[in-house]
Structure formats: structure tokens, C-alpha cells
Regions:
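Cytosolic, membrane-interface loops and tails of multi-pass inner-membrane proteins
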Residues: 30-50, 104, 108-109
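Core segments of alpha-helical transmembrane spans in multipass integral membrane proteins
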Residues: 49-73, 92-96
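Transmembrane helix-loop-helix
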Residues: 71-109, 113-119, 142
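N-terminal signal-anchor transmembrane alpha helix
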Residues: 10-29
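Alpha-helical transmembrane segments of multipass membrane proteins
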Residues: 24-25, 68-72, 102, 133
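Juxtamembrane boundary at the C-terminal end of a transmembrane helix
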Residues: 132-142
Length: 142
């Protein structure tokens, strides 16, 4: 399937998947970048913290989003069900992050979680969830 005949929902999911894969790749190669984005640092009391950034924010993001890109690239063989399934699963990942951040902003407010950074984070996570979920949502509506 060429880009000119690919549904807009698939293009949106592909763009979000490319962004997510790039973020994962950057965190895998440069864990300090991933740590700065999520505003965390390895606990100096325990060894191996950088491996967690490479794994959780690097490899996991890269390959989860890579799976969406692969199903889009192979949609002529895999079919639309594969595209919907892969993109919906990763959409739920982003929706879960937004939900967790919202819960923290409500419950953990004494920890100063109600910040502009977290509000922007919720918006970004919901945007990624919507873009990645678009193929599935379009299927429900169509």
C-alpha cells in the first residue's frame, strides 16, 4: 500500500509511531537524554540505573513503536487487523501513562505534581494515544 492510498488514520498512527520510536532510540543510545525527559536520575545507592533507562525508555519504546511501523509497512500482507491491533496496544500504553500522570496530579499534589510540565505531559500522551488509536477508532466508526 502506498502512502497516497493509505488511510489518514494509518498515517497519523505512523507519524506517532515514528516519533515514539525516535524517542526510544534516543533513550537507548543516550540514556541521559531519556532521564532528562522524564526528569529522573538513577538512585546513587544502587548500581545499574542507566540500564533501566536504556531498557524502559529506550528499548521498550523503540520496539513497541517499531512493531506499529512494521505492521504498517507490511499491511499488504498482514492486513488491517494487524495494524489496528499493534497501534491500539501502543495507544493504550500512552493512555495509561496519561492516566497515571493525572492520578498523580490529583493524589500526589503534596509532592508538587501539579506542574505545567505534567499538564503538557498529559496533553502529549493523550495526543500520542489518539494518533496511535486512530486506526482502531476509525474501524469502530466505519
Amino acid at each position: 500500500m502506498t502512502l497516497s492510498v493509505m488511510p489518514m488514520e494509518w498515517i497519523a498512527a505512523g507519524g506517532a509511531a515514528a516519533l515514539g520510536a525516535a524517542m526510544g532510540g534516543a533513550s537507548l543510545v543516550t540514556p541521559r537524554w531519556g532521564a532528562s525527559v522524564v526528569r529522573l536520575a538513577p538512585d546513587p545507592r544502587w548500581k545499574g540505573g542507566w540500564a533501566e533507562f536504556r531498557a524502559s525508555y529506550g528499548g521498550a519504546l523503540l520496539l513497541a513503536h517499531g512493531a506499529v511501523l512494521l505492521t504498517l509497512a507490511m499491511s499488504f500482507q498482514a492486513g488491517s487487523g494487524a495494524v489496528m491491533g499493534a497501534s491500539f496496544a501502543v495507544a493504550l500504553y500512552w493512555f495509561g501513562m496519561a492516566a497515571g500522570r493525572i492520578v498523580s496530579m490529583v493524589i500526589d499534589c503534596e509532592q508538587e505534581t501539579r506542574t505545567r510540565y505534567n499538564a503538557i505531559g498529559v496533553g502529549f500522551e493523550l495526543l500520542m494515544a489518539a494518533a496511535l488509536g486512530a486506526p482502531f477508532l476509525a474501524h469502530l466508526g466505519g
